[in-house]
Amino acid sequence: MTSLPLGVKVEDSAFGKPAGGGASQAPSAAAATAATMGADEEGAKPKVPPSLLPFSVEALMADHRKPGAKESALAASEGAQAAGGSAQSLGVRPGSLGAPDAPSSPRPLGHFSVGGLLKLPEDALIKAESPEKPERTPWMQSPRFSPPPARRLSPPACTLRKHKTNRKPRTPFTTAQLLALERKFRQKQYLSIAERAEFSSSLSLTETQVKIWFQNRRAKAKRLQEAELEKLKMAAKPMLPPAAFGLSFPLGGPAAVAAAAGASLYGASGPFQRAALPVAPVGLYTAHVGYSMYHLT
């Protein structure tokens, strides 16, 4: 309440003074009025104790005085060191983020950079791939996730007739020897021991060679004889119609055929007989004999 009379007195003194001194005292009066108004506003605002401010000196000092302040400070410093180490492992310097305009020294080329890849040899860039053993992770190799590899089936071995290891080579007979052997075989198919010895010496052959040749020639003659007999049997068979047509003929001559036809058309013999339907013969001995099923000799 003391500011109001002070302001009034200042104004009265200002207006009461002569014009020469009022011009010099006007700024000082305005400043005093502003100071009094600011003091009133500060008195009207509620004052906050300095201990409640988070960034005050008391608050900062109180944090250091707490029992767990040292542990928290150590943890913070360790976290900062770990962050700095990770930044260094990633190739980022601590001052590079804060000062982007600062000139940076060229970093060494890594294996995964463009320069590092260009400097690698060609063998390192090309990965060796093996079709037989592809790379697999351990969980893929377990039978739970991947089926067992299919076994390669080897091609079946060719089953050829195996000859004896101690088999003698085949005897190459000359043309003169073959003609003499054929002539002797036509005369006599079986030779005695004396005849075979004499004949083999005349052809400059051993007795075993002559013996084996005669055995083979007799087997060949037997096969040829059986083939000739089969041909004769096939030629002797009459040309009969196939059984698919089912043609059958009654036994007897033309008279029997005519009688059978009349009996099928007319029931009994007589002057006045009506036509009857043909009835198939029933019985074992009344049926016709089919040439398609039996060969008559």
Curated annotation (Swiss-Prot):
Keywords: Developmental protein, DNA-binding, Homeobox, Isopeptide bond, Nucleus, Repressor, Transcription, Transcription regulation, Ubl conjugation. GO terms for cellular component: nuclear periphery. Residues 1-51, 63-109, 129-169 are annotated as: Disordered. Its main location: nucleus. InterPro entries: HD, HD_metazoa, Homeobox_CS, Homeodomain-like_sf, Msh_Homeobox_Regulators. Transmembrane segments: none annotated. Residues 24-38, 71-91 have a biased composition (Low complexity). The keyword RNA-binding does not apply. Pfam families: Homeodomain. One of its GO terms (molecular function) is transcription cis-regulatory region binding. Gene3D superfamilies: Homeodomain-like. Belongs to the Msh homeobox family. Acts as a transcriptional repressor. Capable of transcription autoinactivation. Binds to the consensus sequence 5'-C/GTAAT-3' in downstream activin regulatory elements (DARE) in the gene promoter, thereby repressing the transcription of CGA/alpha-GSU and GNRHR. Represses transcription of myoblast differentiation factors. Binds to core enhancer regions in target gene promoters of myoblast differentiation factors with binding specificity facilitated by interaction with PIAS1. This is Homeobox protein MSX-1. It comes from Lepilemur edwardsi.
